[in-house]
Regions:
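Extracellular leucine-rich repeat
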Residues: 2-629
Length: 629
């Protein structure tokens, strides 16, 4: 019996070895190419297998055959959108450095699937169905530096799962179902720098008490889109190197006064879209502060090195106290969407290039807006304020000026923008400067007078207003190198607007024809809704005709002489007359035929009635005879 078992086992071995294993050549079914790497420093052999490739049996990744690589290039392979549910063990290759299995349905995997890929550094399982990890997934993948497990279904991570990943610098766990910060699981990642835990279900951050080597080197920490309600003194460890901290899109209501002071390297802090009401202390190293969409009533105390402040859509009612701040390094200030009535500054902001005070309740253009106070300003936003009259009192140099959504503005008066000049860039230092003006969606704006005397515009946007007339002398239209957006206005297409077709329309057609698609007439009635581009290249002055009176139009008498009537016109007229004659004859025939049909029907009806009367009379006589008998 024992000899029989040995013979059977030997037969199976020889039978299996005699069969040839069919390997799947990747470059036959997928796209293989030599491309520069992400840094552009050297070439890599890129293999892309996507849902567009008709690949059979690719679920058995252990049966793939790596392509020949005579130049010894590093290999980057992507298996994307193939519907993979199980990850098999990949065949050996020492040149594979990047593997991506994104947008599949992977739930399980073979033990040690990467044990024969000793130089694997970048691994992505983004957008799969992984609900749990086991230590044997990364047992022999000790060189991984970038691991992406985002958009899976992980609820818990054990310290043993990552115990072999000691060289990971970037870890992405975004959009899973983690209920708490996986501090213990990061213990082995001693060189971790970038950690993304956004869009999970984390409710608190208490890292100060955690003794984890994996958190000491973290420079970028993303906790956005969680359920964090408060930030306290114990939220971050004393010795941390966090430079970028994102806590946006949480439900934070309380931040303790000194909660961020342990972050001595913090440069960027994002607290947008929370419920923060009270201010707190900020570290002295902070340069970028994003606090938009909160409920702050007062300005935080920003450090001297601050360069970017976004306090838009809070509840601020006044500016900061100039005696207690130092904004010499400030480059961007966004306080739009607040309740500020007055914008008056005494101190200069020497480096500010973008100022947004839109959607407040400022009733006039601030008098402090000048090149003296803002010597480097490039972009100014005044949108949505209840400004009724525009006038810049002092000279200001800009590249872009935004004054949209001003519902109380009815007329832009003379010299409104005379003190606004263009700001030269480095590339056009010695050329004539210009600025772009966006004055759109002002529902009551019906007239623009000599507002641009002494100015030079690059682009003018007066779309979606209530303008009916446009003066030829309003500005130097030829200098608008970026075009003019005149769309969605009820233009009165009369002779005074003929110059638009003659001069402005050809210029816009060549430079930016997209700005002509909704450039239409609003009056007179005959032209209502007609696009002005309809008259492009017309030799006649279409808007200067006298045939339209009070919105009602008449057909103008023909000016064509009889000798100029072409044969085609005669043929067409003859066809129309013949068609009318045929139609008339057919109508007469149908009427006559219908009358004849009615007469025949009436005669037939009378005949049937007579026959019926005869039968009834005969029956009555027979009945009478029987009674007599």
């Amino acid at each position: 019996m024992r000899a029989l078992k040995i013979l059977t086992f030997t037969f199976l071995i020889f039978h299996a070895s005699g069969q040839e294993v069919s390997l799947l050549k990747l470059c036959t079914h997928c796209t293989c190419s030599e491309i520069p790497d992400i840094d552009g420093t050297h070439l890599v052999l890129n293999i892309l297998c996507s849902e567009l490739d008709k690949v059979d049996d690719l679920a058995d990744l252990d049966k793939i055959q790596w392509p020949d690589n005579p130049n010894g290039l590093k290999i980057s392979a992507t298996f994307e959108g193939l519907g993979l549910t199980t990850l098999g063990k990949l065949p050996p290759n020492t040149q594979v450095e990047t593997l991506r299995f994104s947008s599949n349905a992977i739930t399980t995997y073979w033990p040690n699937p990467f044990s024969d890929l000793p130089n694997l550094k970048i691994l992505s399982f983004s957008q799969n169905e992984i609900a749990a990890l086991t230590p044997d997934l990364f047992t022999n993948a000790k060189n991984i530096e970038d691991l992406d497990l985002s958009y899976n279904k992980l609820t818990h991570i054990s310290p043993l799962d990552f115990k072999n990943l000691q060289r990971v610098k970037k870890l992405n766990l975004q959009n899973n179902a983690l209920g708490k910060f996986p501090v213990e699981a990061l213990q082995s990642m001693k060189v971790l720098e970038d950690l993304d835990l956004g869009k999970n279900g984390i409710i608190d951050v208490l890292l100060k008490r955690a003794k984890s080597e994996g958190l000491k080197g973290v420079k970028r920490l993303n906790l956005s889109g969680n359920r964090i309600r408060s930030i306290v003194k114990d939220s971050f460890p004393d010795e941390n190197n966090i430079e970028l901290l994102d806590l946006s899109n949480n439900v934070i209501e309380v931040i303790e006064e000194e909660a961020f002071l342990t972050c001595t390297s913090l440069r960027e802090l994002n607290l947008a879209q929370n419920n923060i009401t009270f201010t707190f202390a900020l570290p002295s190293t902070l340069q970028i502060a994003i606090l938009r969409i909160n409920t702050l009533y007062h300005w935080p105390q920003f450090p001297p090195g601050i360069t970017y402040i976004d306090l838009s859509y809070n509840r601020l009612s006044a500016l900061y106290d100039e005696t207690n701040v130092y904004f010499d390094n400030l480059e961007v200030l966004n306080i739009g969407g607040n309740q500020i009535k007055e914008f008056e500054l005494q101190n200069k902001l020497p480096r500010l290039f973008s100022l947004d005070i839109s959607y407040n309740i400022i009733a006039e253009v601030p008098k402090c807006i000048s090149s003296q106070n803002f010597p480097t300003l490039e972009e100014l936003r005044l949108d949505g304020n209840p400004i009724e009259s525009i006038y810049f009192k002092n000279i200001i140099a800009l590249k872009n000026l935004y004054m949209n959504d001003m519902n109380r503005l009815t007329v832009v008066e003379d010299k409104a923008f005379s003190n606004v000049i263009g700001r030269a860039g480095d590339e056009i230092e010695f050329e004539k400067t210009c600025f772009s003006l966006f004055l759109s969606n002002c529902a009551s704006l019906r007239e623009i007078q000599g507002a641009f005397d002494g100015t030079n515009l690059c682009m003018l946007d007066v779309s979606k207003n209530n303008l009916t007339h446009l003066s030829r002398t309003l500005l130097e239209w030829r200098n608008l190198n970026e075009g003019a957006n005149l769309q969605f206005n009820p233009w009165n297409c009369n002779c005074d607007m003929q110059w638009v077709i003659k001069d402005l329309l050809p210029q816009m057609y060549k430079t930016n024809s997209l700005l002509l698609s909704e450039l239409r007439c609003g009056s007179p009635r005959a032209y209502e809704g007609l696009r002005l581009v309809h008259w492009y290249n017309w030799t006649e002055e279409a808007m200067c005709t006298d045939v339209y009176d009070s919105g009602n139009y008449q057909i103008a008498p023909s000016t064509i002489k009889s000798s100029q009537i072409s044969s085609l016109t005669l043929i067409l007229a003859g066809c129309i007359i013949a068609a009318l004659l045929v139609a008339t004859a057919l109508s007469v025939y149908l009427v006559w035929n219908r009358r004849r049909h009615k007469v025949r029907q009436a005669a037939l009806k009378r005949k049937r009635q007579s026959a019926l009367d005869v039968r009834e009379a005969s029956g009555h006589e027979q009945f009478s005879a029987l009674n007599k008998v």
